[in-house]
Structures are given as C-alpha cells and as structure tokens.
Design a protein with these regions (language model features):
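Juxtamembrane inter-helical linkers in multi-pass membrane proteins
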Residues: 92, 258-271, 444-447, 697-698
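Membrane-interfacial, low-structure loops and terminal tails that flank and connect transmembrane helices
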Residues: 256-281, 357-360, 574-584
Length: 745
C-alpha cells in the first residue's frame, strides 16, 4: 500500500460503516414494515377480503405494468395519479359526507367550520385507530366499508372499459381494459386500499402513520412529522459542513507534481497494438448508439401520450402499444445502452492494463457476451410487452413478463440472465487484468480498478432479493440497492477509476494523482452513498430512524459535486495540453458535459428532492423527472457517449471524426436536454409542487389539475427540446456508423 495506505483505510472504513448501517437498518425495514392483515372484516365478523386477495391484487397490478401506470406510495410514472393518494382522498371525501349526514343531515361541504372540524376529528380518529388486532385482522366500520366500496368501484371501472371513464383513461394515458379480468381488478383495488390503509393508520408507539404522514392530505391533517422537518434542517447543516471540509482538504491536499509532468510527444495508447478482443468492440458501439436512438424514440412517444393519452397524432396506438410499454422500453433501453457502454469501456481498458495482451479465448468471451446481451434485450422487451398485453399466463408474468417495478421491469428470468451476463463480464475483466500484477512497479491503481470492477459485477444481485409478493417496503429497499447503490454509487467509482487509468496512461496525469483520485473517490462517493440509499424510502413504510439516516447521509452525496467545475476545467486543460489530444476532443467534451450535468442534475435538482420535508410534498411529481433526466442522461449518458467515442477513436484510428457533425450532435444533445427541462418538466414540477403544498398531493396529480391549458401547453413545449435532442442523437449515431463502416485504408 505504501503512501496510499491511508486512502485504502478510508475506503475500507467507509465500506464497513456504510454497509453496517445499511444492513442493520435493513432489518428494521423487515421488522417494522406495515402489516398485511390476514383479513379485513366488518364489525359483525364478516370477512370482506383476505391477505391472499391483497397479494393476488399486487400480482394483477404488476401485470398492468405496475409502476409504469401511475404511482403507488409515490414511486412510478407521473402521468396518471398516485393511486395511494388518489384513493385516500376519494375515500375520505365519501367518509366525511357519510359522517356529516349522520350527524347534521347535510354534506360535508355544506357545513360550517365548527361542524366540519367536529366531523373531521371523528374521521381522523377512526382512520388513525384502524389498527391490526391480535388475530391479525382489521375491523372496518359500516361507514368506511361503504366509502371503500364506492371508491373501489371507480378503480375497477377505470381499469376496465366503462365508457363513462374513456376520457379519464385518455388523460391518464391508460388503454381500455388495462386489466381485462374483473376479479383481477377487484383484487387490485383491494391492494390499493391496503396501501391507503397503511398511509392513514397510526404506527403503534408513534404520533405518525406508517408512511410518516405521507401523502399530504388536508382532509386528514396529514402534514410533515417533526422528525421530517428537524432532519431536513440537519441535512442542510451537514451539507454545508461537508462542503467546507472537502474544499479545505482539497485546497491543502493539492500537490504540484502535475506541473512536473513531461507530456508525451505521441498518444501512448495509439502506440499499443490492439488486441482481437478490443477490435471486437465495434458491434458494441453500434448497438449502444442504436439503443440510444430507440430509447429517445420511446421517450418521444411517452411524451406525446401526456397530451394525447390513447393515440399518437390521431393514430389509435394505445390499444396495441400503450404508455406503460413505451415507458418500460424507454427506461430499460436507457439502462441497457448505458450499462453496455460501461462494460465496453472496461473490456477496452483491460488489455491495456495487461500490457496490450489478451488472455486465451478473450475475444470469444467478448463475442459471447455481446450476443447474450442481444438476446437479453430482445427477449426482455418481448416479455414485458406480452406481459402487459396479458398474453403470458398470470402465474408466469413475474418470471417472464413485467415485474411492475420501475427500472427493474424485466421478468425475473430475464433479470437472472442479465446478472449472469454481468458476472461473465466480471470474469472476462478479472482474467484480463490479473496478469498485470506480474509487472514491475506500483499496483495500487490496478487494485483500485479491480475493486471497482468487482463492485459493479456483484451489486446488481440485490435486485433478486425480493419476490412477486414481497412487501412494498422490502421490495423498495432492495430495488434502491440497484438503482441508487449500483448505478449512482459503484458505477460512479468505476467511471472515476477508469478515467484515472486512461489519463495516467495518456501521460496527462501523474500516477500518484491518478491513484489518489481513484482510491479516494471510493471513500468520498460511498460515505454518503451507501447509507444515503435510505433517502428513497422516507414514505414507503419505514420508521423515523431510517428517515433521519437517509436525510443525513444523502446530504453528503452532494458534497463532492462542488468541485466539478474544477474537474471540468482540468478536462478542458488536458484537451489543449498536447497536439495529439485534438483527436480525443469529443470524448473529452462529453466528460466536460458530465461535470456540468453532475453539478446541476445530481447536485441542484437532486438535493431539491432530497430533504424529507421537501420530498413529503413533491414525491412523485415532475420535479423527480427533472432529476432523473438530468442525472441519468446528463451524467451517465454523456459519460457513456464519451466512452463510445473514445473506444471508436482507437479501434478505427485511420478514420477521422467529422468535426461539424460531432459539434452539432454534442450541442444539440446538451441544448435539447436543457430545453426539455427548463421549458417543460421543471415548470410543470414547480406548479405541481405549489398545488401539492396548498391542496394536497392528490390534487397535484389529478385529472382536473393536470388538464389545465397551461400545463397542456407546457407539455407540448417539451416537443422543442425533445426534437433537438433526437436530432443530436441521430448525428452521433451517424458518426459511429461512418467510423465503423468506413473502408479500411
């Protein structure tokens, strides 16, 4: 370890502490998850429905696309309502009217303030006190049963083909007969009711509901808990302290060894003879850009569905290709092409680390992995389509069709195939890199890279730790291990280490600086990133301890982003540090874009939805979409594109990039993304946020609110940014086609 010992100690300490917290509080998620009652019963003991009905309803909901049609507990798609908040408001409204008529002979809205307060207090008491008895059942009053049945009827008809709700389905981008079987719809409604029950029932021993008073519902006086407010303030203080510490350490820890670098006259990587496995990566690059274009095409379709919910410019597309499938393919395609770019970058760099040599059968392994990825993409897309079309038997939907959970929509069997493919990539990487340890010299940078490769290789696995009928709180815990920890955590560490290796190999960064950056990034990104996973779980049925942990540690994730301006400047400086660097101009420009969007998308827009008191009001609004697009595409998308063009530069060195085409594509992608956010998603999100704060989450997601002319116009305005973005992607795709298929000189 030598001079790097303190950095390795920091990484090990962060991993031990971080995973201890994540694991220990994970047991709290399991033990404190809101119960699923054995049955809901009437006061005279009649069974209304059972736990088995709820679990069957969960499966039925998954078969519709689940979180791809509206949201449950705030997680999912943003066009239709949040079914938890929507059901709760509808049911409580009916309940208030019933109680008002019983007490005063008039509807709730017709009462005076004093009478309304009295009725509301009675209803609040009943909802909060709807506890599970010792026998595992929950008793519902006759009034609540009536309110539940009236509300349930609406959802049964909405997911069917009742002509009275055709316009509503159009506004929600739902096809007719989203769930064809009546019994499935009835049980799905029971599943929705259960989510509202836990969102309105008091957690034993606390003054809040199981979901920490979420969603904001004025009819029940659902407001942020004192803990949510307090820990939001603490998170801001932690953020400011963290920024101060990082800037201090950065300023005093800077070394001047970079100024002593003697830059090479020629590109060192260009002098390394390409191995067969590296030359085999061309098909990866083509597929990555093709999937990128496909993803944007799906994005254009779902954006149009927000203004014309059952058609595409008059073509009745939804019955055959509904919003839920377009959104599923949009998300899955993005994950596939970004992951494939990262895998390609690793496979390209591994032989360089190994002194320009391939281990035996490495090219065969690279080819096998590619075709396995093709089978995975085609097969999982077909599975999700057939699942939502209900062409797969219900018992097989979770395995082969649509899991119903955002970002992990593909069926469980396809998920296993994906994980096996990632593990196969891990084997290819390790067997290629391991020989480098026989070389002379320091091995710390190699060790850091292997560490990041192993983390990427194994941490997709937790997505397999929940099942079809797992509790939503438990499912969300493991789902965010993949989305947050695997992608936002270990992908970040992998990319930083890979970039360090590339710049060290190019002679633009000293070995010491590259090694320190690679190792320390693990500690810096993961110190907040591992326990910070909990900030996605505030309102999914967890305790206030998890809220406090998520708020505190996730604030630290923003801290290193304050130095991204300097990182962008360093990358720009490297571009002009040697004459031969102009050939790497566009990959470096992509890396500069990563720094910008990391600060804006992950930093500014990420922290906007990070604090508990903020997320309490804006969970599931378009503010989340702002963060998702600017962070996922702005950061990981541009990083992936940078990797693609870097690899293309070296595997086809005789072909020059078309500078005008690349310039157009680069700026079109950046400007298109910025316009999509600034003139559409962000204004919609902010308007929704105000509506949620003043009227409740149900209203901010309601048909009445979302169909206002202003919001319709803002959704149409997205067409401007989307069009520019797609044109930029076409330019990049065409450049890769020209490079890969140009005649070899």
């Amino acid at each position: 370890m030598g001079e790097y010992k303190k950095y390795w100690i920091a990484v090990v300490a962060v991993l031990i502490i971080g995973f201890s917290i994540l694991g220990y509080l994970g047991t709290d998620v399991y033990h404190q998850a809101p119960p699923v009652p054995t049955a809901y019963v009437s006061q005279d003991g009649q069974v209304l429905f059972t736990k088995e009905d709820i679990l069957h309803g969960q499966s039925a909901w998954q078969s519709t696309g689940g979180q791809s049609v509206g949201t449950v507990l705030g997680h999912g798609a943003y066009q239709a309502p949040d079914w938890t908040a929507d059901w709760l408001h509808k049911e409580v409204s009916v309940m208030l009217d019933i109680k008002s008529q019983e007490a005063f002979g008039a509807l709730y809205d017709q009462l005076g303030p004093v009478q309304q307060a009295a009725v509301k207090e009675v209803v609040k008491k009943e909802y909060l006190g709807s506890a599970v008895r010792e026998d595992g059942t929950v008793v519902l009053s006759p009034e609540r049963i009536t309110a539940m049945n009236l509300t349930g009827r609406y959802f049964v008809e909405l997911y069917g083909d009742n002509p009275d709700l055709t316009l509503t389905r159009d506004h929600f981008a739902m096809k007719d007969n989203t769930l064809p079987e009546l019994q499935d719809r009835i049980d799905m409604a029971r599943f929705f009711f259960w989510t509202t029950w836990m969102a309105s029932t008091q957690r034993p021993g606390t003054d809040a509901t199981y979901t920490n008073n979420w969603p904001h519902e004025p009819l029940l006086d659902h407001n942020p808990t004192p803990e949510s407010i307090a820990w939001s303030v603490v998170s801001v203080i932690i953020l400011l302290c963290g920024i101060g510490v990082v800037v201090w350490l950065w300023a005093f820890g800077k070394k001047d060894d970079e100024h002593a670098l003697v830059l090479p006259i020629e590109d060192p990587i260009s002098k390394i003879t390409l191995t067969p496995s590296q030359r085999a990566l061309g098909k990866y690059l083509f597929t990555i850009l093709a999937l990128f274009l496909f993803q944007l095409g799906m994005g254009g379709i779902i954006a149009h569905y927000t203004v014309e919910g059952q058609a595409f410019y008059g073509i009745p597309l939804a019955q055959y290709f509904p919003y839920s499938i377009a959104r599923t393919w949009h998300i899955q395609a993005s994950l596939f092409w970004i992951a494939m770019a990262f895998l390609s970058a690793g496979l390209f760099l591994a032989p360089i680390i190994n002194g320009g040599k391939d281990p035996k059968y490495q090219k065969l392994g690279v080819d096998i992995l590619f075709w396995a990825l093709v089978v995975l993409v085609v097969g999982s897309f077909a599975g999700t389509y057939l699942g939502v079309a209900h062409q797969i038997p219900a018992a097989w939907n979770f395995l082969l069709g649509h899991q119903g959970y955002e970002y992990i929509e593909l069926g469980r069997i396809w998920q296993w195939i994906e994980y096996i493919g990632i593990l196969f990539w891990l084997v290819l990487m390790i067997r290629s890199i391991i020989g480098a340890f026989k070389q002379k010299g320091d091995k710390n940078l190699i060790a850091a890279f292997i560490f990041s490769v192993i983390m990427v290789g194994i941490f997709y696995g937790p997505g397999l730790f929940y099942g079809e009928h797992s509790h939503l709180a438990i499912m969300e815990y493991w789902r965010w291990w993949v989305i947050h920890l695997w992608v936002e955590g270990f992908f970040e560490v992998f990319s930083t280490t890979l970039m360090a290796f590339i710049f060290v190999t190019l002679g633009l960064v000293s070995y010491r600086a590259g090694t320190v950056a690679a190792i320390s990034s693990g500690a810096i990104y993961l110190i907040g990133g591992i326990p910070g996973t909990f900030h996605h779980l505030y309102f999914t049925g967890v305790t206030s301890t998890i809220v406090a942990t998520g708020a505190s540690f996730s604030a630290l994730e923003v801290v290193p982003l304050v130095l991204l301006g300097y990182e962008a400047f360093e990358n720009y400086t490297r571009l002009h540090s040697a004459p031969w660097m102009h050939r790497l101009k566009w990959p470096v420009y992509c890396f500069i874009a990563v720094s910008f969007w990391n600060l804006v998308g992950a930093g500014v827009f990420g922290f906007l939805i990070n604090m508990p008191v903020s997320l309490f009001y804006i969970q599931g609004l378009n503010t989340t979409a702002v963060h998702a697009h600017t962070a996922l595409f702005g950061v990981y998308g541009f990083l992936s594109l940078g990797f693609v063009f870097l690899i293309a530069r070296y595997i086809r060195p005789e072909v020059e990039f078309n500078d005008k085409l690349m310039k157009f594509g680069f700026w079109a992608l950046n400007i298109g993304l910025a316009l999509m956010v600034l003139i559409s998603l962000l204004p919609i999100g902010l308007i929704q946020s105000w509506a949620s704060i003043t009227h409740g989450l149900w209203f901010a997601r309601s048909e009445e609110f979302m169909q206002q002319p202003l919001l319709q116009n803002l959704r149409w305005a997205r067409l401007i940014g989307d069009t520019i973005l797609i044109i930029g992607a076409v330019a990049f795709f065409w450049q890769i086609v020209k490079v890969l298929f140009a005649k070899k000189s």
